[in-house]
From Swiss-Prot:
Keywords: ATP-binding, Cell inner membrane, Cell membrane, Kinase, Lipopolysaccharide biosynthesis, Membrane, Nucleotide-binding, Transferase. Catalyzes the ATP-dependent phosphorylation of the 3-deoxy-D-manno-octulosonic acid (Kdo) residue in Kdo-lipid IV(A) at the 4-OH position. It comes from Vibrio parahaemolyticus serotype O3:K6 (strain RIMD 2210633). Belongs to the protein kinase superfamily. KdkA/RfaP family. It is a peripheral membrane protein. GO terms for molecular function: ATP binding; protein kinase activity. The keyword ATP-binding applies. This is 3-deoxy-D-manno-octulosonic acid kinase.
Amino acid sequence: MIQQYRDSNQVIWFDEELIEDPSQPIFDAEYWQSTNKVTGSASGRGTTWFVQLDTMQAALRHYRRGGLFGKLVKDNYLFSGWEQTRCAQEFQLLLTLINAGVHVPRPIAARAVKSGLTYQADLLSERIPNARDLVSILQEKPLPEGMYQKIGQEIAKMHNAGVNHTDLNIHNILIDDKDKVWIIDFDKCRKQEHGDWKKQNLERLLRSFKKELLKRQIHWKERDFAVLTEALSCLDIK
């Protein structure tokens, strides 16, 4: 069950099945390092730390801004309410998707810390075991048609749940060792009903395939994307 822990300037949302004491410094990488539970890291906009919980591995991410504005204001966001914080919205969106049967990481805990008119945020979520992103896989070998059908079906499930993934690209689609497809990274994504956002999601995904084809010579051809979209259209609710 999801619970909340509050004190004077912060709110923590957490899954009580996975986190017993949210007052522990679970959002500080130094805490996990001191207990020898850091299993790895990945660099992007910031460092994502992979840590070992009792029953699963988790990914710890501090929210950071990108682009030119991010160079000026790295990790502060305007506060407009606890439920409107980036971490709370991503946490809730993951729960919504899981309830809809979409393969996404399980949210473990999220924290927003308010300071004046701004806040900082962190998210602790499940690290999908034995999974690789499409870029990594396609650099080695092409995917069979059936796997593109699975990818299309998973995107359709997400769309049918009314979730607009505003950064859908092949770095954010994973395949695990059981050939299960996962979708990750839902920061700034949202529930949405009307508009052309489903089409825009697919256009963005297609651009990412073409970009990596030029950049890394991945094993991919446009026919693969047609298979993906055909499978998606069979499940997508208009």
